[in-house]
Structure formats: C-alpha cells, structure tokens
Amino acid sequence: MINHGKNIKIFTGNSYPSLAEEIADIIGVQVGDSRVGKFSNGETAVDINETVRGTDLFLIQTLCEPVNDSIMELLIMLDAFKRASAGRITAVIPNYAYARQDRKAKARQPITAKLMADLIHTAGADRVLTMDLHAPQIQGFFDIPVDHLEGVPILAKYFINQNSNTDDLIVVSPDIGGVKRTRKFAEKLHAPIAIIDKRRPKPNVSEVMSIIGDVKGKKAILVDDMIDTAGSIVNAAEALVKMGAKEVSACCTHGVLSGPAIERLENSPLKEVVILNTIPIEGDKRIDKIKVLSVAPIFAEAIRRIYEDMPVSKIFQEE
C-alpha cells in the first residue's frame, strides 16, 4: 500500500496490539520488534529490538484500562524512540485518556487533558493522530500538529446499510454538548434530530429533564462520543421510549464500558449498541446487543496520508 522514499515503522505497546496488527496489515508492513514489560517493582520496562534511526515512526497505543499503565508505556516508548534518533514520531492514540478533564469545573481542580498533552510532547511525539476527542478544543492544548479523526462517517454508514428506508429515523443527542456531532450524523442519514436536556448532579450520574423534538413513532438513534458506565445512554433510551419512540438504538466511538455498564445495557430498552473499537471490547463485554466496528481502515488511511505528506482532512471529504 505504501511506497515512499522514507522508511516507515509501526510499533505498539500492550494496550491493544491486535488493533496495531490490523492497521499494519492494511498498510502492508510488520509491527516493529519491541518488548514492553515490568520490572520486579512494577516499573515499566521497554526494549526496542531493531533500529529506528531516521524512520517515520508511528506508535499505536490506545489509552484504556489499566489507563495509567497504558500512559506510562506510551511515554516511555516515545522517549526510547526519540533517544534512538527516529526521524519523525507520530503518537497514534485512538482513545485519549483524561479528555473529560479539559477545564476547571470547580475551584482547585486540575486540567489533566492539558497535562497529558504536555507529557506526550515532552516525551518525544512530533505529531498526534487520535479520534473523537471528548472536547475537540483539546487539540489546542498541544504545541505539535494533531490530526483528529471522526467516527461519525463509519457509524452513519452502518445505520444507512441497516435501514433502506430512513424516513422514520430520528437522530438524538444525549446532551446539549453533542448537538454538533448529532447534526453531522443526521445529515448523512437525511434525518431530523432531537436533543435530550439533562443535568449531571455528580460524575457518572445524569438525569433527563426534557426532550427537544418529536420522537413519537420514530426509530431513534442515540449518538455519543463515549459510553462509560452507560447511565446517561440508558436513561436517555428509557426517556425516548416513554415519549413514544418505537425503537431505540445507540452508537458511540469509545466503548469504555466500566462498572455496571454491561448490566445496564443488557437490561435497557436499547435494541442495539454500535461501538467503534478504539478500545478493546472483549470477554464479558461482547454481549449480543453490542456490535463492534473496526477503526483500522480509517487509521491505516490516515497513517498513509501522514507518511506521504497528503492532507488527512480529505478522508472525510471522500466519505
């Protein structure tokens, strides 16, 4: 797939090696030879077992459970590649951790999303490739280029293929903050939108206040960037059914699915939950209601474009 004067290398940490291998396979290269383990005291140990001098290097490491271990692996590997004289280092981070801590919601709180950006840059990244940041303005926390991919085209294409007649569809934003994403999704389906007005009295707890829009007799599709404990999405689905929606599905980019999420989804009125695999969804999380779509093709195409110095934004124009 790639034919260029520079030498490309793809490496991965331990957070999601199967995704890195899928991306590398599409590009037509092998994942680089490295070992990431632990010293006896729990510190992260990294060995890079091949030369990377002068290469265009892409380190694929999503930031998922155990989150802080994933972060330390990323930072230490970036440092190793920088000290080994890699020509250009792109940190490929499908899911960017601490993205919800992007501002001071109350006094004396940290802005950890900014701290993360500083750490990644200082460790050695020359560029970042990520997908659906919880707050897009996090791109401005970096002093290096950030290529920000969107999950909406992949998710919308799935629902278009599943619904030959989109006349009875309505796309629903689970909160005011997600309206822009929901509108993009709805435009692809040529469907109207509705908005759920909710309040969040404390973290991971939400209450539906009202629904803006007519969902009666419609097939509703809830669109979010992330499903964590699934409280918000399940509350929204229950409210939509109560308001007369004949069917409710949900989709998101990042399936964190922590704590009671799986049990809540199982017991919810949701017909289907479509999730992109920016985070591994394995074992007990692979319930019948959950449909997982791969992000490997879009990341492979973005890596190809970065490597060949082509515009990444054209990916979305070609969708």
UniProtKB/Swiss-Prot annotation:
SUBUNIT field: Homohexamer.
Keyword Transferase in annotation: yes
Residues annotated as catalytic: 198
One example GO MF annotation: kinase activity
Top-rank lineage group of the source organism: Bacteria
Protein name: Ribose-phosphate pyrophosphokinase
Keyword Cell membrane (UniProt): no
Pathway assignment: Metabolic intermediate biosynthesis; 5-phospho-alpha-D-ribose 1-diphosphate biosynthesis; 5-phospho-alpha-D-ribose 1-diphosphate from D-ribose 5-phosphate (route I): step 1/1
Positions annotated to bind Mg(2+) 2: 175
Cofactor binding notes: Binds 2 Mg(2+) ions per subunit.
Residues the record lists as binding D-ribose 5-phosphate: 200, 224, 228-232
